[in-house]
Amino acid sequence: MKDGGESKEQQLTVALRIRPINETELAEGATIIAHKVDKQMVVLMDPMEDSDDILRANRSREKSYMFDVAFDYTATQDTVYRFTTKGLIEGVISGYNATVFAYGPTGCGKTYTMLGTDWEPGIYIRTLNDLFKAIEETSDDMEYEVLMSYMEIYNEMIRDLLNPSLGYLDLREDSKGVIQVAGITEVSTINAKEIMQLLMKGNRQRTQEPTAANKTSSRSHAILQVTVRQKSRVKNITQEVRVGRLFMIDLAGSERASQTQNRGLRMKEGAHINRSLLALGNCINALSERGSNKYVNYRDSKLTRLLKDSLGGNSRTVMIAHISPASTSFEESRNTLTYADRAKNIKTRVKRNLLNVSYHIAQYTSIISDLRKEIQRLKKKIDEQGLKQIRSEKSDIRNIQAEVQLHSSTYGRHEMEQLKEQLIRAFREQMDIRRQLMEIENSSMEMQMETSRHFLITAEWEQEKTRRARKWRDEHRKETYGKDDSEKDSDTGDDQSDFIEPPEVITARETIQILEGDQNKLRRQKLELEKRFRDVRHHARRLEEALPKRISSDDQREILSLLCKVHELEIENTEMQSHALLKDNMIRQKDYMVQRFEQHRSLCDEIIQQQRRIIYDHNLTVPHQLNDLYELYFRELEEGVLDKAAVLALKDSQSCLPKIPNLTAEENLQEPDSDQESVRTFGSDNRNPIHRDSYKNLLPQILSETDSDTNKVFKTSPRARHLKNGAVVTPPPIHVNGIISKEYLPRNQINYFPDSTDSKVVLTHREKKEITTSIQSIAVKAARRRSRVLEGDRLQPMKERSNLSVHSMSESEDTVFTDQRFPSSSLHHAASEDNLSSTTGEIVAVHGGGSNHRDSPNLWHRTQKKQAQKLEKREESLEVKRRKKRSRSFEVTGQGLVRPKNHISRNRALESNSDHKIQSNTLQTNRKIMLPIAQVKLPQNQTTTVFKMAEQQEGKHQTNQPGSVKKLISTNQPPRFNYINANASGIYVKDVRVRKY
């Protein structure tokens, strides 16, 4: 090594950088206490300043510090680099040593300053770029060799970041006092891209762990060493080699365990970090004392041993101190400023590193060959310059323009490719971040729904526990009531029994805690991604703004603008997907709410049916207001108001209504179907169990208000629906007293389930004949019933004209009453062949005593057979007489009564979804067709053919029932109209109301 001449004294350069305050510090209520006054002065405010302190009343608590350069939160990475490190590159190439290190507490931005990000590179990358640019500028006269090594000091152990498989390395010192790391990997490169790739590879191997103070805290000191060897291209017997070293160090931050909340390995790492930084601080204190020969202990730490030349030896050193402006970090900021202020007094002696190489005689031949190669290179260069001069003399303006255009197009194409790559990289990064945000949002929504579900479980348990506690207190109060004081004192120890939580509640609470922790993690990840996205978007916008300045061709501008538009469309597509995902989650939550409300509505239907059954079973008096509410309830069920919204909302989900229970043969005996066709044989529900199960489990179809029969609480049997829609043909309009009853369109035959067997019912010839015969007599019986209602109104006073049951209007020969209670059945249609043939004065007597008919089902079956035989004989005689005496003006085709088109029948008995049957004490007649009666308004003074025919039929078929009244209709009485409203649920006296107008 040759002496590089006299050494020059160099003062250590100290810069200060104040990072911006973060959201965590603002959330803690911190204020800004560090301020940059000018380019060199920084003021630190004391947040604990007390105006009431008498001893320090006139003393300022502010501390001001002067540095070589100061930066606040507005300074960019390029500004920090230009004022601190850029001036060291020329000295490194010339053979001088240089050192740049970042110092400060944890979480203050040291790694950001040294390493930076992809779109805001730090000092590492900027220094290496400028270093290779300087090498290229002087490569014509000088030869260069660049070596790079990258290491970290982790827990006082040195590890190679470029080759981690080497393990921990030793620190050695040679005879000349130069510190060397034994076995470190030195990579030789002359390309900036290669050295960048090596740098990124080493950064991925560096130890980083999150702490409470910093989520990406560096747990080691990283040291990047770049060695540059420079020698002349002109060979000689002796040659001079200049060796310059550049150290760039990212120190780990000093930390307090109370702030970082470290435990275990993290605390051990923090102890080693603080130990090495303390040794560095002691070295700074010893070196900063002027005029003292105090011993500087570099051997306390491996960090100070590596920085020996940088601090007190042959090096130009720059120290960049970092502090936080928050008041919560006042102590750490003050200590950092104190050490940085002392470091200004450190001076180093800088000299150039020169190596004199003397070649042996055996190497002379190689020197001669190298000199010849250099001569050839220089001649070739001279020839190229001569050709350029000749071309320039002979060329005209056109050739010059063509050459300029060629160079400009080549440069423009290269510039465009670079911009294109940068734009595409920025766009892809934005898309990746957006997709990650969308995935995090989706996961967060799913966790919220899962948390809500578990909260419902715990809330239900809390309500149940409160109910049990209240019940226990009531029972305890009843037990202790009446006891003497001694017994009460003995019972005070057992105040309330402990309720053990079910396993599902315990699991729900544990799951809620886990989900809340996961949600907090997702929230933090979302904040980080949003911050990254803002930075990337800002970088992309700057590139888009630079397009018009850096590109001159219109075609290239158009291509890049189209590229930007494509990216904008991709971003909009991603945003639409995100919005669709959010809406899907909202719809899922609403479906869950609708399902819960549907379950609640089903429970309310069950309660209503049970209450109504209890009222009818015990013959309780129903208030008028409650009866109106029942009518409104059943009307809404008929019209589908309550069910239509639920069907629309739950058409793609499973039905939450209670299932219809499976009935055995005995249960069918006790609760026959609401339609008379279903009572024909016992246990008819068990004929096709597959059909019944599918009928229960499948969801109802979406129908109109008039056709939605399956959505109602009560519904007709499949047999009755088939007979009503298939066998009965709509007759022509019937003129009654000038009032035309409009034709009622039959309901559409809709098969609700794919395995339904309703369409397979085949009627025999005898059944069709019986149906036709029974339907033809309905009009006559209806007219006869209305005439007797009018006669009853004439004879009875107003107060006795109470609501009459439709089922009380049955003839004595059709119904046999005994003291035995018949099996309860569901609600009947208001208009049937049985309840249309009675007189108006009949009232059904309900006997509470007697044996239960459920014990003797055979007796009930025999009674029905006898009744069926009587009905057949009576209908045959009635049909013969009716054909002889009826008027031709009232011609019925035998297809049944017509109904108004706009009439919605409320008089049909329906099967319940929530409650299987509503009990009734009325006996059903076998094998009859039941049709609802529309409201018919008839004047009492009209003696039409209908009433005459009814009177003739009355004379032939007298009844012996008590309460039937026979009286001629007066023809000179003023007209008076009666409206008979038959309710579908009206199986008792108070369900049919006769209103006079």
Swiss-Prot record:
Residues noted as binding ATP in the record, renumbered to the chain: G104, P105, T106, G107, C108, G109, K110, T111
Coiled-coil spans in chain: 360-437, 508-577, 861-889
Location of this chain's protein in the cell: Cytoplasm, Cytoskeleton; Cell projection, Cilium
Chain segments carrying region Disordered: 468-503, 662-690, 792-811, 848-890
Composition bias type Basic and acidic residues, residue spans: 468-491, 792-802, 869-880
Keyword Nucleus in record: no
Pfam family, one: Kinesin
One GO cellular component term noted in the UniProt record for this chain: microtubule
Domain of life from the UniProt record: Eukaryota
Listed Gene3D superfamilies: Kinesin motor domain (3.40.850.10)
Example of a GO biological process term: plus-end specific microtubule depolymerization
GO MF terms, alphabetically ordered: ATP binding; microtubule binding; plus-end-directed microtubule motor activity
Domain spans labelled Kinesin motor: 11-346
Keyword field: ATP-binding, Cell projection, Cilium, Coiled coil, Cytoplasm, Cytoskeleton, Microtubule, Motor protein, Nucleotide-binding
Purpose: Plus end-directed microtubule-dependent motor protein that regulates the length of motile cilia by mediating depolymerization of microtubules at ciliary tips.
Protein name (Swiss-Prot/TrEMBL): Kinesin-like protein KIF19
